[in-house]
UniProtKB/Swiss-Prot annotation:
Transmembrane segment boundaries: none
Protein name as annotated: Glucokinase
EC number(s) stated in the UniProt entry for this protein: 2.7.1.2
GO molecular function: ATP binding; D-glucose binding; glucokinase activity
GO biological process, one term: glycolytic process
Binding site for ATP: 11-16
Protein keywords: ATP-binding, Cytoplasm, Glycolysis, Kinase, Nucleotide-binding, Transferase
Domain of life of the source: Bacteria
This protein's GO CC annotations: cytosol
Organism: Xanthomonas euvesicatoria pv. vesicatoria (strain 85-10) (Xanthomonas campestris pv. vesicatoria)
Compartments, record wording: Cytoplasm
Length: 335
């Protein structure tokens, strides 16, 4: 590994694991993949301690950082639900001896990653073909990702600058599109009261859909995990297969609604831990039909590309993209 002369430490901090890598803001491929490492958060008392351990392990000293955090960033602090760390930007920067440290939301990082994605990093799920455009070309993108929850965001590119949109679109009310989905909504309403998109389109959402289908059929499915449903679907179980089909169709409807709300005409990027696991189903399901089925806008929607992000470290890539964008805005900051 050859470290850049002025490396930027980038991180993707989740509820269970912390991933670190180095970035070179002057390189054509800023994220240095061979420097990435992953650690369990429970093994360290703080974010600064984990970051220092990483830097010591690879033998590099950085003075700049961009850390993406799976939680809300409020001023100097970031909070992650059920997380052992209290993350303070100023205290972490002081501990590491950093002159500059940015804390950003993890889905802002997912959005920023779009600016560095290459064709080999994505798989087409429908619509017009997509290729990266010059940074000075105006574009509007959407990003949506089911994992433990449902993240929704966007990226606006103007005059060579990237502006991530941080939203809570996963908590928008679920709009059923078929009689079957209306019945599922009724069942979930009895359990949750208000039903958001996140109640269906995420890992636990797979379980919610399956349980609703089981109740409709008058059977008890027993204890279930999302991985049980995907495994049973792969083995040909009809109810699990129907669960995956509904998941993909509803996912498509929600992603299409996001395009209309954000004006994300240049493409929607599907990210998150579940996407690679259901990729084949997304490509051969009702995802695109529901994505495009938007009344008077159906013809326009048919041209909007939807792309599954397959980059293994999209969060780190987005943190690196943020560092590159900061360099464009304040050239002296990263020097």
């Amino acid at each position: 590994m050859t470290a850049p002369s002025k490396p930027v430490l980038v991180a993707d901090i989740g509820g269970t694991n912390a991933r670190f890598a180095l970035a070179d803001v002057d390189a054509s491929v800023p994220l240095l993949d061979d420097t990435s490492r992953e650690f369990a958060v429970v093994d360290f008392g703080s974010l600064g301690e984990a970051a220092r351990y990483y830097l010591d392990q690879i033998g590099v000293q950085a003075t700049q950082g961009v850390f993406a955090v799976a939680g809300r960033v409020d001023g100097d602090e970031a909070r992650i639900t059920n997380h052992p760390w209290v993350i303070s930007r100023s205290r972490t920067a002081t501990m590491l001896g950093f002159s500059t440290l940015h804390l950003i939301n993890d889905f802002a990082a997912q959005a920023m990653a779009i600016s560095l994605l290459r064709p080999q990093d994505v798989v087409q799920v429908g619509g017009a073909s997509w290729r990266p455009a010059p940074i000075d070309q105006a574009r509007n993108y959407g990003v949506i990702g089911p994992g433990t929850g449902l993240g929704v965001g966007g990226l606006i590119i103007r005059n060579g600058r990237c502006f991530p949109l941080e939203t809570e679109g996963g908590h928008v009310s679920f709009p059923p599109g078929t009689p079957e989905e209306i019945r599922i909504l009724e069942i979930l309403s009895e359990q949750f009261g208000r039903v958001s998109n996140e109640r269906l389109i995420c890992g636990p959402g797979l379980v919610n859909i399956h349980r609703a289908l089981s109740e409709i059929a008058g059977v008890d499915p027993g204890p279930l995990q999302p991985k049980d449903i995907t495994a049973r679907a792969a083995a040909g179980d009809p109810r699990s297969s129907r669960t995956i089909d509904l998941f993909c169709a509803i996912f498509g409807a929600i992603a299409g609604d996001m395009v209309l709300m954000q004006g994300a005409w240049d493409g929607v990027f599907l990210t998150g831990g579940l996407v690679p696991k259901v990729l084949d189903s997304l490509q051969h399901s009702g995802f695109r039909q529901r994505f495009e089925h938007k009344g008077r806008f159906s013809a326009i929607m048919s041209k909007v590309p939807s792309l599954a992000v397959m980059h293994p470290h999209a969060g780190l890539l987005g943190a690196a993209a943020y560092a590159v964008d900061a360099q464009r805005q304040h050239p002296g900051e990263q020097r």
